[in-house]
Amino acid sequence: MIKIAINGYGRIGRNVLRALYESGRDKNIKIVAINELAAPEAMVHLTRFDTSHGRFRYPVQLAGHSMLVGEDLISLFAEQDPANLPWRALGVDVVLDCTGVFGSRADAELHLGAGAGKVLFSHPADADVDATIVYGVNHQVLTGRERIVSNASCTTNCVVPVIETLHREFEINCGTITTIHSAMHDQQVIDAYHSDLRRTRAASQSIIPVDTKLAKGLERILPHFAGKFEAIAVRVPTINVTAMDLSITVRKKVTVTDVNQALQRASRGTLSGILDYTEEPLVSVDFNHDAHSCIIDGTQTRVSDANLVKMLMWCDNEWGFANRMLDTTRAMMAAG
């Protein structure tokens, strides 16, 4: 039995809990605790009702200082300092740190010092962590000695399996990526102050360029592409699901059919459950609650002069990523 604690019960934290239960209930993983500064009543309410993902089909209620999900009692804490959390007493094997705030080795060591066996960040972390994992691409590098791991980002998990597949087939020279990301909590409902002047503007009224470290994150997973990719990102007025526009140049001459068939083979083979492929006339909302890291829209693949390839891919940046958090947790524990 893998005992996990969730630190930070926001979008990803809640989706991890729901994904664990809705996937058919992995009997080998049990959530024993959640640490969140919000009111317990709000935590219960937002577990039961979700604007993007609908009603949770399991009953959820407060039970003293715990949350009862079905018949499972989950201890609730509201502790600012992770060093004060009772991970040792609870026998926590892995802390899923979903705060989006912590990301350094020193941050993770607070959980370890409190008795947790391992820590998995739900976001890009500093370079001094033991490993950064994109499940399906490099989770095999886990040896069991890693105690502090990052699950990278939703966009890294979306694009890296595609890049790795196409490089293996056609040898990529370089590329650019545009992330078209749904709005996030760090944006404003109406115009308000923010250190990033673009983010002072109402999220529902504009397409808003934002900074991204996606290219650097990609290099950490695929170091042979250091300096070969650049990325930009915009936020759009939707609340979930992200599109990614990938352009690459390849050494081998290719056609649209070559590219699409390579991705279809990967989706049926080594990347089954991670990569999906469609040629249906779908829009972003159709990928809501999709557990894949990436879904290729084969109708949008383009090839120019046999070497320049452009394609469109989708991901549910919440649900898909939450499922990868659970996959990486299993891989960390299976490694030892």
Curated annotation (Swiss-Prot):
It is found in: Cytoplasm. One of its GO terms (biological process) is pyridoxal phosphate biosynthetic process. Its EC number is 1.2.1.72. The record marks 181 as: Activates thiol group during catalysis. It is an enzyme of class 1 (oxidoreductase). One of its GO terms (cellular component) is cytoplasm. The active site is at 154 (nucleophile). Keywords: Cytoplasm, NAD, Oxidoreductase, Pyridoxine biosynthesis. InterPro entries: E4P_DH_bac, GlycerAld/Erythrose_P_DH, GlycerAld_3-P_DH_cat, GlycerAld_3-P_DH_NAD(P)-bd, NAD(P)-bd_dom_sf. CDD domains: GAPDH_C_E4PDH (cd23937), GAPDH_N_E4PDH (cd17892). NAD(+) binds at residues 11-12, 317. Substrate binds at residues 153-155, 199, 212-213, 235. It holds the Pfam family Gp_dh_N. Catalyzes the NAD-dependent conversion of D-erythrose 4-phosphate to 4-phosphoerythronate. Belongs to the glyceraldehyde-3-phosphate dehydrogenase family. Epd subfamily. This is D-erythrose-4-phosphate dehydrogenase. It comes from Aeromonas salmonicida (strain A449). The gene is epd.
